[in-house]
């Protein structure tokens, strides 16, 4: 007869399913474990299998596997089964690990907008991740949104004032902007007229403004219209004419003290402060001390046409005077060009016709430089005259400078050379600086002549070209006559000679660097080698001197010829040095051989 057992499954430490089985009491506890696993799998096919760890009685005592079931558990007794879940096997042999938490789902899932779908593999109802959002009207906990509409008073309840929003601009465009601006400006003007009369205890101004006051200040409202946000009229922008108002000139500035009413930014307030009537009067009085930036800004102002013609005429005349002052202030003056002569570089001055050939030779041999200084503090009168060099009419400048020089020369106070030397433009000076001193008549001369045509008169250019041609012809004649060379201390202005004789030091450097020996071009390498070998044989073989007398005479003739053609001494030639090294090496080898023989 089989006994009835009530099984309570504890899987992974949690209470699980409960079921009953009929079991043979003569069987062991180990067989009971196998029976429980098979029954659990048959009852719950969609859940993970269990592996029984231990079986206990009602008092939670552990029971060994060797005991019989009838001895421990009577009929209808409670059996506690401790187990852990094992993964399921798929058809392909792979394991699936299930947990009970992932399988559980609410019964009212459809009411909570969860759609359950049937799994294709094992039929488990899984929760679909797609959820439809409920309508906002059905949400009872919907919070009321705050109203961000700007209020006239920032301290009124139920509204949030945001001073940094776009609507706080002074010239914002909206459907009700005109009415709102009229209201707020009327409040501000009312506050100016009676700052304490209509103010309440909490700081809110009374809004009872009459229509007449708004009409009186219509000019102030029209200047703030968004159609013309950047153009202002000096005469009408601050014209607030009110018979009952005794406010001073700073009344428009007091309207800016409340940004919550006029909603004007710091940049607009700064502009109104800088362009107030008092500031404009002060600016016209101190126009000489204002920097360039303020002058530019004052000339850029564009006045708007107004019905008052007198004010328009005054503004136009003041703008014209401001422009003239700015042009005089920003006039660019060219630096004064002063040409002086010192004794270090060739002079760029043109010699006169009365100079003789001796004076021409002296000017060619001597050296002078042209120093250009742009400091107007040395002589203000002459520098003012010289600053006009860049003007279009340069002939008048030449006449002025020549007359100035003649006047100073009569008084004995002349500090500058004659006008023929002074009237040299920067182009001719740069050309003269780049021109080599020893090549007169080259291409640079023609370039400098062409450049100087714009500033030097034509007569002076003709004289200059004639003198240069005469000087060049004289230098060529002197070169053909073979005149003695001038000393090296003075820089020579003659043409370089085509055939130059190099010095001894230069030849020695060339011989050490490039060629082993400088010899006559007619001698070939083979003849030079044969001559050197014959010379060595003549020196070494003294016994055969009588037999080779003819060859030695030829050798001496060749050596004398070579010595005449080569200015380097024999002892300093590269071939002689190499031969001496070879001889020393041979002697050393012979000495070593002798020592080896002795040993």
UniProtKB/Swiss-Prot annotation:
Composition bias type Acidic residues, residue spans: 307-320, 436-452
PTM info: Phosphorylated by clp1.
Name listed for the protein in its UniProt record: Nucleolar protein dnt1
Protein task: Negatively regulates the septation initiation network (SIN) pathway, independently of the cdc14 phosphatase clp1. May also have a role in silencing rDNA transcription. Required for maintaining the exclusive nucleolus localization of nuc1.
Residues where Phosphoserine is found: 174, 306
GO annotations of cellular component type: cytoplasm; mitotic spindle; nucleolus
UniProt-listed GO biological process terms: deactivation of mitotic spindle assembly checkpoint; division septum assembly; negative regulation of protein localization to mitotic spindle pole body; negative regulation of septation initiation signaling; positive regulation of G2/M transition of mitotic cell cycle
Disulphide linkage map: none
Biased composition (Basic and acidic residues): 292-303, 321-333, 402-413, 483-500, 533-542, 558-574
Main location: cytoplasm
Subcellular location: Cytoplasm; Nucleus, Nucleolus; Cytoplasm, Cytoskeleton, Spindle
InterPro entries found in the cross-reference section: Dnt1-like_N (IPR018844)
Listed Low complexity bias regions: 242-251, 364-380
UniProt entry tagged with the keyword Cytoplasm: yes
Region of interest (Disordered), residue spans: 210-262, 292-599
UniProt keywords, alphabetically: Cell cycle, Cell division, Cytoplasm, Cytoskeleton, Mitosis, Nucleus, Phosphoprotein, Septation
Residue list for modification Phosphothreonine: 513
Species in which this protein is naturally found: Schizosaccharomyces pombe (strain 972 / ATCC 24843) (Fission yeast)
Keyword Phosphoprotein: yes
